[in-house]
Amino acid sequence: MTNKEAFELAKKYMPGGVSSPVRAFKSVGAEPIVVNRGFGAFVEDIEGKKYIDYMLSFGPLILGHRSEIVVSKIMEALDKGNSFGITNMYEIELSELIIKASKVIDKVRFVSSGTEAVMSAIRLARGITNKPYIIKFDGCYHGFSDSVLVGAGSGVATLGIPGTPGIPKEFAALTIVLDYNDENALEEAFIKYKNQIAAVLVEPVAGNMGVVLPKESWLKKLRDITKENDALLIFDEVITGFRLALGGAAEYFGIEPDIVCYGKIIGGGMPIGAYGAKNHIMERVAPEGPIYQAGTLSGNPISVASGLAILKTLIKDIAIYDRLSELRAYLTYTLSKMLSEKGIPHRINEIASMFTIFFTDKDVIDFKSAKTSDTALFGKFFRNALKEGVLMPPSQFEAWFLSTAHTKDVVDTTLEKLKKAIDLL
């Protein structure tokens, strides 16, 4: 069966043929591939074509596809049972590792997705402060729950819609959307909504409008202004947690949030999410406190065992972060040089082992500047690269990721293929 035939079949049974909109490749004008398997830095489609993968399932596969360490741990857990609805030892071990690595939380609660982690963190913030409003930032994506699918990036930006039908205006009215990196707007919001703001929710490095780096003065401002106004600072580290550093963005930038949300890497490609905070906050979560949150599959042994294997590897070999950062810098420097030689305006925003190429001549510091990108040109670049065997995220507004399986040889091969893709632009 060809990719085209399989996708036509998928469309018969699933909306748009996908389980998540960006997978339809609509914004890049490409025929979607249907994956058969992944191995190391590669995926292979059902036609047998191999691609060097820089999506990595949108971030969780920091050790690459089908890592022996991860697969072995999953099989060990699976041999004991796939779900219990009761606390298991893998869950306890993973929670201990997350807490020790983060250095900013005392307790953690597992859920089944990043969306659930953020939903729970918002409820916790509102329950503690008894205030209604949440501040988020234009272009930051925090999952698809009603409270935060306002001014979102990622798939919503790709579809070109501001939110989605089905969310009552009353929900949106309690979410204040500001520009990323704008200190003045932040100050004005706290004046206008004095004593009504429960929390500021932020991706400390935006990854869902493409990679957008925070001004460090702005991050510090977030911390200071929330403390001054008895509001909580929530870091959505679903992408950046264990990606920027062992302690995530909190460690990388030296800013301590009140609540941290995790996902992706802590499950190694299995469904998972988590949120954590200091004891005085987490003691308000049921069953210790009155703020309710629950889930049948939360902390399921397969997901937490997978995450446990990854975190143990990262803790044992902390130099992984430096190696990945150096490899990313080599890739992006050479890629930028190729684009410049071709006379193509671009900006590459990069940090640790993640980056985004924006086809624009403007510095990208927020969603407005990200949207100056030539998305049609990106689409052509994507299609050219796909033909050459390089799989990048199928949206201008997503991050590329590297894994430990991306060796120097793999990156050199990538650059050879991308040179051909660029020459055809």
Swiss-Prot record:
It comes from the Bacteria. HAMAP family: HemL_aminotrans_3. InterPro entries: 4pyrrol_synth_GluAld_NH2Trfase, Aminotrans_3, Aminotrans_3_PPA_site, PyrdxlP-dep_Trfase, PyrdxlP-dep_Trfase_major, PyrdxlP-dep_Trfase_small. It is found in: Cytoplasm. One of its GO terms (biological process) is protoporphyrinogen IX biosynthetic process. Pathway: Porphyrin-containing compound metabolism; protoporphyrin-IX biosynthesis; 5-aminolevulinate from L-glutamyl-tRNA(Glu): step 2/2. It catalyses: (S)-4-amino-5-oxopentanoate = 5-aminolevulinate. This is Glutamate-1-semialdehyde 2,1-aminomutase. One of its GO terms (molecular function) is transaminase activity. Its cofactor is pyridoxal 5'-phosphate. Keywords: Cytoplasm, Isomerase, Porphyrin biosynthesis, Pyridoxal phosphate. Its EC number is 5.4.3.8. Belongs to the class-III pyridoxal-phosphate-dependent aminotransferase family. HemL subfamily. The gene is hemL. One of its GO terms (cellular component) is cytoplasm. The modification N6-(pyridoxal phosphate)lysine is found at K264. It comes from Hydrogenobaculum sp. (strain Y04AAS1). The keyword Iron does not apply. It is an enzyme of class 5 (isomerase). PANTHER family: GLUTAMATE-1-SEMIALDEHYDE 2,1-AMINOMUTASE, GLUTAMATE-1-SEMIALDEHYDE 2,1-AMINOMUTASE 1, CHLOROPLASTIC-RELATED. It holds the Pfam family Aminotran_3. Homodimer.
